[in-house]
């Protein structure tokens, strides 16, 4: 379920249960070395409610699914002024951080070049990542999913990729 546009359009509990049941079927069918990443988004395509609207709901799904289910953080999927570095810290602490869709945003899920609008926030996120991964003895290159999620409609994708990894 992608949520709802207005009150009364969706039964929140049924939407959660239906999504959980679907995820449980997928999780049960996974090959042994696969993981499930549950991504959340505060809005879009709907604005009244989302079935996986924040990191807490994603973590709830991941915990209900099992040890190979994790929360994926997309930097553009938060409400304005969300403390993403705190979210990263807590998910790392719980061993439930899957990885990232790296991008940036000014107005919503803009999928802009990572660090182009909020470079200091990106620094704070990486500060938590290094400290938290070191505390857990994690491999910086392999233990999380590192993905760039930028819009090819905004600028040349190769240019964006090069600027993102600089």
Q: Which sequence ranges carry the predicted segments?
A:
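A cross-domain feature marking catalytic cores of carbohydrate-active enzymes
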Residues: 1, 38-42, 71-77, 101-104, ...
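Active-site acidic/histidine proton-transfer and metal-coordination neighborhood
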Residues: 1-70, 139
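Gly/Pro-rich active-site loop or hairpin
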Residues: 10, 48-56, 78-165
């Amino acid at each position: 379920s992608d949520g709802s546009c207005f009150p009364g359009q969706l039964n929140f509990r049924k939407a959660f249960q239906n999504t959980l049941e679907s995820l449980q079927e997928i999780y049960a069918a996974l090959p042994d070395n696969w993981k499930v990443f549950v991504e959340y988004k505060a809005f879009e395509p709907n604005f009244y409610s989302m079935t996986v609207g924040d990191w807490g709901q994603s973590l709830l799904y991941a915990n209900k699914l099992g040890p190979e289910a994790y929360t994926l953080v997309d930097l553009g999927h938060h409400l304005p002024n969300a403390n993403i570095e705190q979210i990263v810290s807590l998910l790392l602490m719980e061993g439930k951080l899957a990885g990232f869709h790296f991008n940036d945003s000014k107005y919503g899920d803009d999928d802009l070049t990572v660090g182009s609008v909020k470079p200091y926030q990106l620094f704070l996120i990486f500060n938590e990542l290094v400290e938290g991964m070191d505390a857990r003895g994690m491999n910086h290159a392999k233990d999380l999913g590192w993905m760039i999620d930028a819009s090819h409609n905004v600028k040349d994708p190769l240019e964006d990729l090069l600027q993102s990894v600089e």
